[in-house]
Curated annotation (Swiss-Prot):
Family membership: Belongs to the LpxC family.
Membrane listed as a keyword: no
The protein's name: UDP-3-O-acyl-N-acetylglucosamine deacetylase
Source organism phylogeny: Bacteria, Pseudomonadati, Pseudomonadota, Betaproteobacteria, Burkholderiales
Involved pathway(s): Glycolipid biosynthesis; lipid IV(A) biosynthesis; lipid IV(A) from (3R)-3-hydroxytetradecanoyl-[acyl-carrier-protein] and UDP-N-acetyl-alpha-D-glucosamine: step 2/6
A Pfam family assignment: LpxC
Length: 305
């Protein structure tokens, strides 16, 4: 059977919170089959566990924020994206603040951490959310849609109308049957505009944001000396975010995702719409790994890496 996966050993790192600017400790621990991805605020007098779930996402203005009984864990999308890309079903994530450290602004550090810990198959079938009917959410000209598809593919379009962004690809389609998440998506960094960063700092946010963890643009150009990691890094980062946002449903999706100018809020609304329509999806497993979609039937250390 196609099995669930966790990590083999405990791994730790330290990074900066993009909003608080504070040093944050992050520990990844193996978890039993059926656990899912569980975030734990270990800095509180009594640690609070918040399982990743579509219905636990609260605030989505600047990041995907998990909330439970007034306790928050913000900026979970890059780590969730790495877990999706590496096929991790079960994991404990201990964090010493209300946000996951931003690291370099991509999912690459989290991929490295998970691969350093090693990946272990577990004696339980991997469960997928198979989309059976089209589900769509619109907000003005923005939209996000899930269509039935035997595999996992995404098509994302952005429209930033900025000279530096216009020069790069604003639309990207990726099918993980024939694309490496680790090579093609994981290293794409978050991006922001210098004038917005100033506004956010005045609001007490983005105190940890810098060119060390984001692509920064002024009105005309990219300010980072080292330029871009991919020619189309902007749209690739939006896709990286979407993969993480969608993975909070708790299982990998068997679906085709299409989006135009979507963000954390629309992605979460799409998951909630799917879950509200019980005839639009089903949970499936694969007794024969070869019967699973290409990209998931892996012998290697990764899902669609």
């Amino acid at each position: 059977m196609l099995k669930q996966r966790t990590i083999k050993s405990i791994v730790k790192t330290v990074g900066i919170g993009v909003h608080s600017g504070r040093k944050i400790e992050l520990t990844l621990r193996p978890a039993a089959p059926g656990t899912g991805i569980v975030f734990s605020r270990v800095d509180l007098p009594t640690p609070v566990d918040i399982p990743a779930a579509a219905t636990s996402i609260g605030d989505t203005r600047l990041a995907s924020v998990l909330q439970k009984d007034g306790v928050r864990v913000s900026t979970v999308e890059h780590l969730m994206s790495a877990c999706a890309g590496l096929g991790i079903d079960n994991l404990y994530v201990d964090v010493t603040a209300e946000e996951i450290p931003i690291m370099d602004g991509s999912a690459a550090t989290f991929v490295f951490l998970i691969q350093s810990a090693g990946i272990e198959e577990q004696n339980a079938p991997k469960r997928f959310v198979k989309v059976k009917k089209t589900v769509e959410i619109r907000d003005g000209d923005k939209f996000a849609r899930l269509d039935p598809y035997f595999g996992f593919k995404l098509k994302f379009s952005i429209d930033f109308r900025h000279p530096a962004v216009d020069k790069t690809g604003q639309e990207l389609e990726v099918d993980f049957a024939n694309t490496s998440y680790v090579r093609e998506i994981a290293r794409a960094r978050t991006f922001g505009f210098a004038h917005e960063a100033e506004m956010l700092r005045e609001m007490g946010l983005a105190r940890g944001g810098s060119m060390e963890n984001a692509i920064v643009l002024d009105e005309y150009r990219i300010l980072n000396n080292d330029g871009l990691r991919y020619d189309d890094e902007f749209v690739k980062h939006k896709m990286l975010d979407a993969i993480g946002d969608l993975y909070v449903i708790g299982h990998p999706l068997l679906a085709s995702y299409t989006a135009y100018k979507s963000g954390h809020g629309l992605n979460n609304a799409l998951l909630r719409e799917l879950l509200a329509n019980e005839d639009a999806y089903e949970i499936v497993t694969f007794d024969d790994p070869q019967a699973a979609p290409k990209g998931f039937a892996f012998d290697m250390q990764t899902a669609f890496a």
